[in-house]
A protein has these predicted regions:
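Conserved alpha/beta-hydrolase catalytic His-Asp/Glu region
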Residues: 103-105, 121-181
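Hydrolases whose catalytic domains are alpha/beta-hydrolase-1, hotdog thioesterase
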Residues: 79-83
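Post-His helix in hydrolase/transferase enzymes
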Residues: 224-235
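Active-site loop/oxyanion-hole signature of alpha/beta-hydrolase fold enzymes
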Residues: 22, 31-71, 75, 232
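Conserved serine/cysteine hydrolase catalytic core
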Residues: 152-210, 214-217, 223
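Flexible "cap/lid" loop of the alpha/beta hydrolase fold
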Residues: 85, 89-124
Length: 236
């Protein structure tokens, strides 16, 4: 039975995977850690992607995971993709995260002065408003609203590379990671909450030709809108 490593999104914690875990067949060894600085995980001075990957890998090794399926939601999918490029995995499941910086990067960079001041929360609230949370079932919506602890140090820390590095550089790295994952024989499955653009699909398949793409309607939280379906995808 496949080992599973489940990584939550920015500001959230391991509880956001509970509905998916409840749908998994027994027998899987599952690790759903809190990302550094989230939940009960210690805060850090830096949340660079490479550091976060190694912290998670240490947890996975300690739990005895062997070539796990690594599933990540949102920022967790960025971590999952980076993880799979440097550590053995059987498959990556990316839940609703495009790997191109695009307009999101522009919005983050423009928001930096506000993020560093007393009104930082307005930036996060504006982003939440576009995530389709209101369309989720009641229990899922409650989970999204409670299994979260936004802080400016988390936002600035995890977005530091978007803030400080050229988008082209970040995107070239993402493409290289996809090619490495493909060369290693690991699968890549993108679960998106909305119909993807042809431009992005072309980019994804240029670097991960065998990538599977599944649309699971549910705004930014398809794993909470339809946990049974996403559990089936993760379990393979």
């Amino acid at each position: 039975v496949t080992d599973l490593l489940l990584l939550h999104g920015l500001t959230y914690d391991h509880r956001t995977w509970d509905p998916v875990r409840a749908e998994l067949a027994p027998g899987h060894r599952v690790l759903a850690p809190d990302l550094p600085g989230h939940g009960t995980a210690p805060r850090r001075a830096s949340y660079s992607l490479s550091e976060v990957v190694e912290v998670i890998h240490a947890r996975a090794e300690a739990a005895g995971l062997v070539r796990p399926v690594v599933a990540g939601h949102s920022l967790g999918a960025v971590v999952a993709t980076a993880y799979a490029a440097v550590h053995p995995v059987s498959r990556v499941v990316n839940v609703d995260q495009v790997l191109l910086v695009g307009p999101f990067g522009t919005a983050v960079r423009e928001a930096v002065p506000v993020l560093r001041g007393p009104h930082w929360r307005t930036v996060w609230d504006r982003m939440l408003a576009g995530m389709g949370i209101e369309s989720l079932p009641d229990a899922a919506r409650t989970l999204v609203e409670t299994a979260t602890d936004p802080r400016p140090d988390l936002l600035l820390g995890y977005w530091s590379e978007i803030i400080e590095r050229p988008a082209e550089e970040i995107e070239a790295e993402a493409a290289a990671r996809l090619r490495t994952i493909t060369a290693r024989g690991a699968g890549y499955h993108w679960v998106t909450g909305r119909e993807p653009s042809e431009r992005y699909l072309s980019w994804l398949r240029a670097h991960a030709p065998g990538a599977a793409v599944t649309v699971v309607p549910g705004g930014h939280f398809p794993h909470l809108a339809d946990p049974a379906r996403v559990a089936r995808i993760i379990a393979g």
